[in-house]
Amino acid sequence: MYEYFKGIISKITAKYIVLEVNSIGYILHVANPYAYSGHLHQEAKVYVHQVVREDAELLYGFATEEEKQLFLSLISVSGIGPVSALAIIAADDNAGLVQAIEQKNITYLTKFPKIGKKTAQQMVLDLEGKVVAADGLAESKAPVQTVDNQELEEAMEAMLALGYKATELKKIKKFFEGTTDTAENYIKSALKMLVK
């Protein structure tokens, strides 16, 4: 088992990053790959969890130890696998997730991909009182400004019209939240991120 890898982020895709450690490139599946864009071709420390299956060995990466612990808590719940756990972490500020578990808010929990009522109830049963918000994540995902960014919205709508997937665009949009730019520049930057 591995605790973390320290290496150079050499590639970023919509689903994973590649971390080069001692001339070996490791594919790390992460919640929001574009959050690592500022560290492309730079050294980074990424916490990891290894999943060994009959047909594959997969590595999941996390920005903080708290994010990794939240992931491990989620996959301990019957009905939640690694892919679903990453989707939950990517879609929420984590503080909201923990609050929903503590308040037994089944409706809130069922908004996550592939989480039905039964799995949401199991989450509450298994995790109530056992999880804490990943503080670093909640802080880093909070938008710097709360006003609507019309230019960013326009850019995302244009890219959706061009055929890009909404799931990819959602991750990119999160990366740009709190910034100010023109729709044209947002599109150019987003295209660069998508082709890397």
Curated annotation (Swiss-Prot):
It holds the Pfam family HHH_5. The keyword Transmembrane helix does not apply. One of its GO terms (molecular function) is four-way junction helicase activity. Residues 64-142 are annotated as: Domain II. The keyword Cytoplasm applies. Residues 147-196 are annotated as: Domain III. One of its GO terms (biological process) is DNA recombination. GO terms for cellular component: cytoplasm; Holliday junction helicase complex; Holliday junction resolvase complex. Keywords: Cytoplasm, DNA damage, DNA recombination, DNA repair, DNA-binding. Residues 1-63 are annotated as: Domain I. It is found in: Cytoplasm. Residues 143-146 are annotated as: Flexible linker. The RuvA-RuvB-RuvC complex processes Holliday junction (HJ) DNA during genetic recombination and DNA repair, while the RuvA-RuvB complex plays an important role in the rescue of blocked DNA replication forks via replication fork reversal (RFR). RuvA specifically binds to HJ cruciform DNA, conferring on it an open structure. The RuvB hexamer acts as an ATP-dependent pump, pulling dsDNA into and through the RuvAB complex. HJ branch migration allows RuvC to scan DNA until it finds its consensus sequence, where it cleaves and resolves the cruciform DNA. Homotetramer. Forms an RuvA(8)-RuvB(12)-Holliday junction (HJ) complex. HJ DNA is sandwiched between 2 RuvA tetramers; dsDNA enters through RuvA and exits via RuvB. An RuvB hexamer assembles on each DNA strand where it exits the tetramer. Each RuvB hexamer is contacted by two RuvA subunits (via domain III) on 2 adjacent RuvB subunits; this complex drives branch migration. In the full resolvosome a probable DNA-RuvA(4)-RuvB(12)-RuvC(2) complex forms which resolves the HJ. Has three domains with a flexible linker between the domains II and III and assumes an 'L' shape. Domain III is highly mobile and contacts RuvB. Belongs to the RuvA family. NCBIfam families: ruvA. This is Holliday junction branch migration complex subunit RuvA. The gene is ruvA.
